[in-house]
Amino acid sequence: MKTIIAEKPSVAREIARIVGATKREEGYFEGGGYAVTWAFGHLVQLAMPDGYGVRGFVRDNLPIIPDTFTLVPRQVRTEKGYKPDSGVVSQIKVIKRLFDTSEHIIVATDAGREGELIFRYLYHYTGCTTPFVRLWISSLTDKAIREGLRKLEDGSKYDNLYLAAKARSESDWLVGINGTQALSIAAGHGTYSVGRVQTPTLAMVCERYWENRRFTSEAFWQLHIATDGCDGEVVKFSSSEKWKEKEPAMELYNKVKAAGCATVTKAERKEKTEETPLLYDLTTLQKEANAKHGFTAEQTLEIAQKLYEKKLITYPRTGSRYIPEDVFAEIPKLLAFIGTQPEWKDKVRAKAAPTRRSVDDGKVTDHHALLVTGEKPLFLSKEDNTIYQMIAGRMVEAFSEKCVKDVTTVTAECAGVEFTVKGSVVKQTGWRAVYGEEKEEITIPGWQEGDTLTPKGSSITEGKTKPKPLHTEATLLSAMETAGKEIEDDALRQAMKDCGIGTPATRASIIETLFKRGYMERCKKSLVPTEKGLALNSVVKTMRIADVAMTGEWEKELARIERGELSDDTFRKEIEAYTREITSELISCDKLFGSRDSGCACPKCGTGRMRFYGKVVRCDNTECGLPVFRLKAGRTLSDDEIKDLLTEGHTKLLKGFKSKQGKSFDAVVAFDGEYNTTFVFSEAKKDKKFSGRKK
């Protein structure tokens, strides 16, 4: 008998149908000489510190660096601590029995780093020695599964993939466990979660937040003239320079207004080609789904995974935006299929050779770019259909013709002021026709250098400089992809992918972790760090744990392990040294977290004392631990203001707060019924009964 192990029951069911394993047993399907079983995600994990006989959150025990990591069944948290998940333990027993009684194992977990780790951890935990082969496929269509089963690969081919996954798992444990415990010990109260990837990601969110909030807008003035264009249209020139002072701008404006003519000093005409966009990888799909439809990164990944399991798209957790030659041969057939759908009727070119920009064998990693499979998308929800049609539409764009424009730039001088105007006319719409996104054309007459223009009007406008906007999930994903470097070019971004932080498969969960930890929140599409997030970042922002570039280097090292260019032992030694350094740094934060008595009892429990710990005031009763963060809407509460809040349940009216939109406001800070702080505004204060009890 052969055992096939899939990553989840739904995939196992499809494979079982294809191999004829139709008899349902407890935890697997059987038939046709096969047993088809499944995991449900990671059934086996690295043990927590107590699994090594080490008590956690003890200063003298840090750093905790096991000689060898111990694997245990996935655990769940209970009132008495962590214990193995009973359902997981039962499934592991089923899998072990099947492994031990099989002639060989076919590994059908997801074809990627985490899928490989799910199987290998199980294999090692069960002490299995049965030989295994790998089913490596990029879609779950019947055709792909059958072809994959005919072309099974030796399991050892993916040893480096496993070693990279194992190194990632162990490094996250070392940094996360030691960093979190060190900082929490330094703080004295509460738990401050840090991680190899989550903390640098939070640092980027906080850095952009402060850059936005501390930005001082400055006024500027710009001049404009208008003249007749083609077919009665008006062409509007704008001054090349912008003035920070109104007086000199007005002085020049009056001269321009009085002038009767302008002279063309330069006329430049060029043909501009806009290449087709590359196909989607997961991160680009997540970015555009967030920007265009407001989907979270996690939501997009969940939908893409669902579409994959429904056989509608190829493997979603891909980091490549290219396809190999053999897949390109199937593109005409797939485009013809897309063209039969109502959404894309008349958008797919008939009998035309697809553009090859997204075709490059050398740029395909484990999986090629996202494609639809040719299976009909029936009975999809609105959200699922949105993601499916995005992938289909991108395929149509990527394999259409280039967009070609004639671009004209004209410079003219009037009363000593230089003015410019740019116009474009589309010669070949190409891929821009797919969504009809091409902007309205601006036709510039055939002016030549030395031509005299007669202005039909002039104006002066006032503008204001704007800060960089707060991060959205789309822009944060871009920053994670390039370790904070601002790169717009698709090809350059693709070249940087090994230096980013996180991977396409993990970035969504990293962002969600920051929400779950209470470090940031969504304000419409913007990501805003919470008081807790800002407080944490203020402590660690200059430390190595928050270094975005270095985290990008770790990802690069993991990619080298995957390619067989770096030993996992070398990486392990480096990450252990790093763990010792960041643990020492974070433990020393007790200087920053030095506590002192506020002189106030806890308003919530009444038995504890409220103590100042740097950016937070916290109850010293461990069963209560009420936290009050001093930083509120860009303003830090003083000791006296905190004492008013603790003793009266509210402060006096305070000035100098700044809203998430950057507007200043005045308010009272008060406790609500759950002892969370809230703002009460002056007009409402007269009728407001504060919920927090006075002690």
Predicted regions and their residues:
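Short strand-coil-strand connectors
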Residues: 30-32, 226-230, 413-417, 661
